């Protein structure tokens, strides 16, 4: 059975792919657990760390609109792939940023990561809703639950990894985990072609 036919026969694969992506990309919801290690690693004052968070949130808001436009013009797979690239760029940028350059965190991490997570969200949400045309509330609930659980998951991840490998190690692990999940999810979304199904 081809992957396209598998998706057609098992529409739950769309929800699974979307939920897995959301679970790993809830950076705005989990910033609280990142803030203290980031302040220590990059020698940032609390105000500077708060600025990084504010820029992350602003980039997420702008990215939801831009991601929606991109999806309308190029399709959900394109939006998801761009989102993956931006998210990975932000995580790698934060991991590689010299400690003395902590002032650059909003530009190196917050903007690309905020845009990336936002590009992924509308692609996942709209495709899930269209595939579950008769059960939009259910589809939205699954994706929303994964987004909510993302904060708890990332909190556990950072609290486990940061004491051992530092916040840079946590950024690398998160990026390494998110890359295959987001790429596989984007491929699944692309194969689905957002057809109305259930």
Per-segment meaning from a language model:
Residues 23, 90, 102-119:
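Hydrophobic core of transmembrane alpha-helices in multi-pass small-molecule transporters
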Residues 29, 57-65, 152:
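Residue-level signature of mid-helix packing/kink "hotspots" within the transmembrane helices
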Residues 37, 68-69, 160:
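Membrane-interface helix termini in secondary transporters
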């Amino acid at each position: 059975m081809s992957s396209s036919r598998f998706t057609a026969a098992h529409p739950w694969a769309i929800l699974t792919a979307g939920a897995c992506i959301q679970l790993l990309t809830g950076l705005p919801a989990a910033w609280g657990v990142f803030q203290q290690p980031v302040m220590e690693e990059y020698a940032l004052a609390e105000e500077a760390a708060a600025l990084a968070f504010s820029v992350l949130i602003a980039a997420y808001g702008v990215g939801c609109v831009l991601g929606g436009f991109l999806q309308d013009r190029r399709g959900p797979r394109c939006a998801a792939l761009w989102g993956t690239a931006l998210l990975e760029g932000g995580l790698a940028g934060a991991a590689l940023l010299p400690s003395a350059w902590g002032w650059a965190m909003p530009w190196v991490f917050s903007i690309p990561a905020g845009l990336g997570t936002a590009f992924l969200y509308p692609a996942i949400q709209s495709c899930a809703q269209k595939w579950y045309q008769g059960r939009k509330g259910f589809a939205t609930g699954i994706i929303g639950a994964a987004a909510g659980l993302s904060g708890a998951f990332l909190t556990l991840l950072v609290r486990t990894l940061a004491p051992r490998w530092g916040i840079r190690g946590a950024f690398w692990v998160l990026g390494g985990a998110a890359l295959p999940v987001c790429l596989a999810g984007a491929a699944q979304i692309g194969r689905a072609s957002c057809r109305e199904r259930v």
